[in-house]
């Protein structure tokens, strides 16, 4: 993604109060933090199956979208917004949780597979390509073995962060916002050099 190319920023998560603050909703949390920083509000947009806010004006405008379709159907909302605004897929960035990354780590990529994530799988299906940018936000994995991980995946991603974890999440989301500015100013590669090396203070497991 070239500097200034980003036009649609999508955070993945599940709608409803029961999912607020859960690990699976860290994409929503990032957009909420950005909206607060920019003093903008999300409004329901039925044609996009989600909540939308806008930052910037004119040719610098970026839409923020939180699909309200539940995670497994996130791609419907993304496709609807891409089509409505006449955007190209390379103007899209998706913010998504990732169990394969420790809590506190970030991975910015220009493309890639779903990696077992249902929201990304839906996006790839509806867009017809996996060549879109995504920022994976680590939430860590439960258990020490593959069997434990499989048994505890649902409770882990739908669970809320502990108080200690929330301190790390605050640092991570601050870094995400810095990274989004860098993507617009410097492009994906240079922003990735910083984001992919990020390590929050006080995180020995990172």
UniProtKB/Swiss-Prot annotation:
The question of whether tRNA-binding is a record keyword is answered with yes
| Active site (catalytic residues) | 24 (proton acceptor)
The enzyme's E.C. designation: 3.1.1.29
The superkingdom of the source organism is Bacteria
Give the principal location in a single coarse category.
Answer: cytoplasm
A GO BP entry is: rescue of stalled ribosome
Q: Which InterPro entries match?
A: Pept_tRNA_hydro, Pept_tRNA_hydro_CS, Pept_tRNA_hydro_sf
Name its cellular compartments. Answer: Cytoplasm
Signal peptide segment? none
EC class (word): hydrolase
User: For tRNA, which residues are the binding ones?
Assistant: 19, 70, 72, 118
Cellular component terms per the entry's GO annotation: cytoplasm
What Gene Ontology molecular function terms does this protein carry?
A: peptidyl-tRNA hydrolase activity; tRNA binding
Q: Which CDD domains match?
A: PTH
Q: Name one Pfam family in it.
A: Pept_tRNA_hydro
Q: Spell out the residues of the site Stabilizes the basic form of H active site to accept a proton.
A: 97
Q: What does this protein do?
A: Hydrolyzes ribosome-free peptidyl-tRNAs (with 1 or more amino acids incorporated), which drop off the ribosome during protein synthesis, or as a result of ribosome stalling.
Protein family (similarity comment): Belongs to the PTH family.
Q: Quaternary state and partners of this protein?
A: Monomer.
* Listed NCBIfam families: pth
The molecule here is called Peptidyl-tRNA hydrolase
In its UniProt entry, the species of origin is given as Prochlorococcus marinus (strain MIT 9303)
- Which gene holds the coding sequence for this protein? pth
């Amino acid at each position: 993604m070239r500097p200034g190319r980003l036009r649609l920023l999508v955070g993945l998560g599940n709608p409803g109060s029961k999912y607020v603050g859960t690990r699976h909703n860290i994409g929503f949390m990032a957009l909420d933090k950005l909206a607060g920083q920019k003093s903008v509000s999300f409004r329901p947009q039925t044609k996009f199956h989600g909540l939308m806010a806008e930052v910037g004006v004119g040719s610098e405008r970026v839409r923020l979208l939180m699909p309200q379709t539940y995670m497994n159907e996130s791609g419907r909302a993304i496709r609807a917004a891409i089509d409505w605004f006449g955007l190209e897929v390379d103007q899209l960035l998706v913010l998504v949780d990732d169990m394969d990354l420790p809590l506190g780590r970030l991975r910015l990529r220009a493309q890639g597979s779903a990696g077992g994530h249902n929201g990304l799988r839906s996006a790839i299906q509806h867009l017809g390509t996996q060549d879109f940018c995504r920022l994976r936000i680590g939430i860590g994995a439960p258990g020490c073995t593959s069997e434990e991980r499989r048994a505890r995946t649902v409770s882990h991603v739908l669970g809320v962060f502990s108080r200690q974890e929330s301190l790390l999440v605050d640092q991570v989301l601050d870094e995400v916002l810095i990274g989004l500015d860098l993507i617009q100013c410097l492009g994906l590669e240079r922003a990735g050099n910083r984001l992919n090396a990020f390590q929050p203070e006080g995180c020995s497991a990172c």
